[in-house]
């Protein structure tokens, strides 16, 4: 029967079996665990390839209801194919093919260009092969019910495979047209050399290959390859033909410009049956096996002269070329921001709509992306699957472990072009660069204060709300931010990780160390515009400026007295509460202020750090030292307003005033 007699015309719906078979030929499924192993770049590549494949099917007259996975990908979601879903159904139910759990790709994505490490899984090979055999029997039963399906399937396969594409390689300005002789599998019957059996139709070979995969795993064609799909077999045959597809005269590149429909890999997981004859290297994935084979033969996949990456599918090459050329074709209509991939644009647009469809069942918090929700949920479970081999610290995400390990290696790839400072993460570099640009994107709606980081804004807003969610397990004290809690805990542990290289003094936080180091360099970066006085740190500078403004924002609720600094108010309030939290370990005497405790402890140690240069007399505290120096200078700063007499000390002036009263 001619192939076109029973073939569906463009726009005509085929049977459910036909639709499912054809769509599976361009589908790759991942389980939740496998999807989590892919990085963000691999996921975006998967999304773009799947969407492009679907559009190509529509362009050749293949009309079906939009699959659920396409709906998800258009929304920027990932394909969550869970094990145990999509059970076997009859042909009449519209299911014809392999369960997603049987079409899983072992390890990383098949379209990734570089060969990854081998993926070791605990899946039982024999149970998978048994299920594959059952699938073959199911397909045979469907075939007996629908004799016309074979010719329709053959027609559709030919139509897809013979679709010609014009590929423009912009680096050289040439159009490359694939030869019609490329489709070698359509010019002769599909044949298995190791069995000597020929088949008339693609589907017969598909069934036969799957059946014999369970029986003859170790039997080979040319070098140990077993196929479960006829398109995979045809693809493999081309590696032995030595055909040069389309050669570029100007650059000498040889490109196999095939259609962009990705191949559905169906190979038993965990079995190392793909062996390269050139190097003897064993691969667990077909895609990894084909990549080196194409390099050994005269056939070459798409290559880039600018880098070493190799791609076996054109859509991946197109996306990668955009990265090299910095082409951003997808533009946001709201803000004008441009993106290389459509999936990135879809994800970005949710920031304008404020749509957060993914909600945590534990706390009700919502997220833009599924990946963000999954990352958040680990905070509730406390699960930390990834452990650092150096220090044993655990992490809930592999990406967080990779970032952490750079602390041990000292690796800092991201360098600031302005000041040369290097960072372990690109996001940290971007945050740092806002210091140079002055950009403060995060603004408080209550007081208008702007911040460089969103985390700083969130911590600041808790000043207005009074929220202190982080509580110390040792003393019960609460803090508005996690970093403040971690810093506070060092009081209990005595940890001082930041050490001065000049004098060896240790500090609980980096900012105190930075301030201290300026005492060695003499640097005073903050200068008062009113009086010209300079300060080593911003906090003291801000405190000083309130002297000129007269502002005293901190008021005591008991007596109404106002103070410039919050710390002064806290110290003052201890007069009303009689609280003395600072206790001497030697004599158990208590003090309301920490500086008073330090001065007191010098009585026990005998330390007198303040020495008079005139007479050599030493003092335990600065105030007594300053009083003593007025004897040598003759300075009497405290004067009586009634008689004008001057005194060296304020206490003596107070005693003198009693004469006038």
From Swiss-Prot:
It is found in: Nucleus. Its main location: nucleus. GO terms for biological process: regulation of transcription by RNA polymerase II. It is linked to A chromosomal aberration involving ZNF81 is found in a severe intellectual disability patient. Translocation t(X;9)(p11.23;q34.3). It comes from Homo sapiens (Human). It comes from the Eukaryota. Keywords: Chromosomal rearrangement, DNA-binding, Isopeptide bond, Metal-binding, Nucleus, Repeat, Transcription, Transcription regulation, Ubl conjugation, Zinc, Zinc-finger. May be involved in transcriptional regulation. This is Zinc finger protein 81. There is a cross-link at residue 266 (Glycyl lysine isopeptide (Lys-Gly) (interchain with G-Cter in SUMO2)).
């Amino acid at each position: 029967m001619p192939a076109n007699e029973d073939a569906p015309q463009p726009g005509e719906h085929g049977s459910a079996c036909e639709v499912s078979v054809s769509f599976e030929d361009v589908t790759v499924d991942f389980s939740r665990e496998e999807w989590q192993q892919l990085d963000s770049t691999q996921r975006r590549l998967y999304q773009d390839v799947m969407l492009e494949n679907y559009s190509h099917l529509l362009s050749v007259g293949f009309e079906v209801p939009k699959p659920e996975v396409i709906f998800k990908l258009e929304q920027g979601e990932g394909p969550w194919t869970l094990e145990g879903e999509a059970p076997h159904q009859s042909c009449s139910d519209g299911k014809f093919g392999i369960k997603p759990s049987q079409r899983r790709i072992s390890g990383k994505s098949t379209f990734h260009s570089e060969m990854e490490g081998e993926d070791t899984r605990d899946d039982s090979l024999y149970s998978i092969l048994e299920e594959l055999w059952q699938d073959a029997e199911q397909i045979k039963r469907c075939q007996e019910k629908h004799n016309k399906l074979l010719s329709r399937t053959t027609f559709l396969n030919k139509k897809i495979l013979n679709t010609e594409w014009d590929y423009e390689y912009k680096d050289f300005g040439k159009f490359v047209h694939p030869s019609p002789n490329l489709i070698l599998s359509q010019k002769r019957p599909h044949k298995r050399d190791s069995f000597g059996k020929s088949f008339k139709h693609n589907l017969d070979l598909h069934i036969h290959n799957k059946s014999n995969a369970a029986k003859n795993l170790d039997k080979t064609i040319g070098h140990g390859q077993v196929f479960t799909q006829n398109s995979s077999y045809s693809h493999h045959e081309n590696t032995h033909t030595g055909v040069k597809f389309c050669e570029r005269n100007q650059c000498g590149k040889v490109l196999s410009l095939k259609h962009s429909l990705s191949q559905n890999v169906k190979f038993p997981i965990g079995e190392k049956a793909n062996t390269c004859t050139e190097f003897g290297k064993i691969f667990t994935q077909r895609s990894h096996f084909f990549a080196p084979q194409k390099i050994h033969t005269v056939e070459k996949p798409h290559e880039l002269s600018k880098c070493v990456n190799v791609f076996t599918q054109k859509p991946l090459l197109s996306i990668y070329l955009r990265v090299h050329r910095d082409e951003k074709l997808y533009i946001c209509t709201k803000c004008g921001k441009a993106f290389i991939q459509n999936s990135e644009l879809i994800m970005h647009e949710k920031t304008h709509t404020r749509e957060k469809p993914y909600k945590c069942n534990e706390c009700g918090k919502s997220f833009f992306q599924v990946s963000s929700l999954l990352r958040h949920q680990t905070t509730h479970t406390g699960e930390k699957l990834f452990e650092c081999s150096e220090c044993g610290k655990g992490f809930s995400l592999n990406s967080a472990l990779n970032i952490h390990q750079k602390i041990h290696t000292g690796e800092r790839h991201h360098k600031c072009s302005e000041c040369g400072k290097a960072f372990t993460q690109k996001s940290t570099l971007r945050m740092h660069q806002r210091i140079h640009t002055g950009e403060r994107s995060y603004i408080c709606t209550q007081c208008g204060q702007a911040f460089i980081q969103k985390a700083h804004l969130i911590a600041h807003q808790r000043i207005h709300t009074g929220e202190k969610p982080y509580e110390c397990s040792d003393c019960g004290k609460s803090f508005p931010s996690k970093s403040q809690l971690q810093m506070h805990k060092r009081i209990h542990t005595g940890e001082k990780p930041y050490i001065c290289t000049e004098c060896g003094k240790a500090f609980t936080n980096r900012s105190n160390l930075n301030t201290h180091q300026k005492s060695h360099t003499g640097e005073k970066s903050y200068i008062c515009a009113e009086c010209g006085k300079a300060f080593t740190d911003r906090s003291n500078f801000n405190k000083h400026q309130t002297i000129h403004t007269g502002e005293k924002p901190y008021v005591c609720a008991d007596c109404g007295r106002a103070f410039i600094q919050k710390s002064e108010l806290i110290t003052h309030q201890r007069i009303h509460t009689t609280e003395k939290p600072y206790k001497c370990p030697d004599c158990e005497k208590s003090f309301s202020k920490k500086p008073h405790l330090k001065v007191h402890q010098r009585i026990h140690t005998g330390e007198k750090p303040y020495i008079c240069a005139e007479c050599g007399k030493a003092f335990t505290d600065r105030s007594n030292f300053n009083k003593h120096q007025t004897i040598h200078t003759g300075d009497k700063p405290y004067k009586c307003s009634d008689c004008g007499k001057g005194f060296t000390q304020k206490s003596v002036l107070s005693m003198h005033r009693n004469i006038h009263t």
